[in-house]
């Protein structure tokens, strides 16, 4: 199984679109998780071309406020989808591998860039992780550190929640 998590910072640039389509074919990707897509909806033609024509199932989380949206897709030749859950800061797919029946979770996150929302983001993530018993792949743009100058104060503010969630 191969996949990619990418903060694409918008999909309006044809070079980014072509890069992702080519990458999907070249690396034979089974999932694609994008943040900051800048899109509230996507046509079927757009999505089919984005994954290089493969048979993908997609979920679009539209932009809201400063959050610029998410897009999560899986290859239906590789996986069966059980359920899709959308939180304020995540999209979760419950997946079953077609080849061996193994069940697991694929979670794409896009954390709040504003410090005032960090607590909400980490709390939601902690609740998500605590309630699940299946193995999980969790990735995306956590926005925990936004530059070298803020590193010391931001980690101090959030490290308790973040690191307790991981343990």
Annotate the PLM regions.
Residues 1-167:
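A shared catalytic/ligand-binding motif for oxyanion handling
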């Amino acid at each position: 199984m191969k996949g990619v998590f990418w903060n694409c910072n918008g999909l309006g640039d044809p070079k980014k679109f072509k890069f992702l389509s080519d990458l999907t074919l070249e690396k034979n990707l089974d999932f694609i998780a994008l943040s900051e897509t800048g899109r509230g909806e996507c046509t079927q033609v757009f999505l089919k071309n984005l994954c290089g024509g493969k048979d993908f199932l997609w979920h679009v989380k539209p932009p809201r406020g400063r959050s610029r949206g998410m897009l999560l897709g899986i290859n239906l030749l590789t996986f069966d989808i059980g359920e899709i859950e959308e939180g304020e800061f995540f999209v979760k797919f419950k997946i079953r591998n077609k080849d061996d029946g193994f069940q697991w979770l694929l979670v794409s996150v896009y954390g709040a860039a504003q410090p005032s929302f960090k607590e909400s983001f980490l709390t939601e993530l902690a609740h998500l992780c605590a309630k699940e018993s299946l193995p999980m792949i969790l990735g995306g743009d956590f926005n925990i550190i936004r530059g070298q100058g803020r590193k010391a104060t931001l980690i101090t503010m959030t490290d308790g929640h973040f690191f307790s969630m991981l343990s």
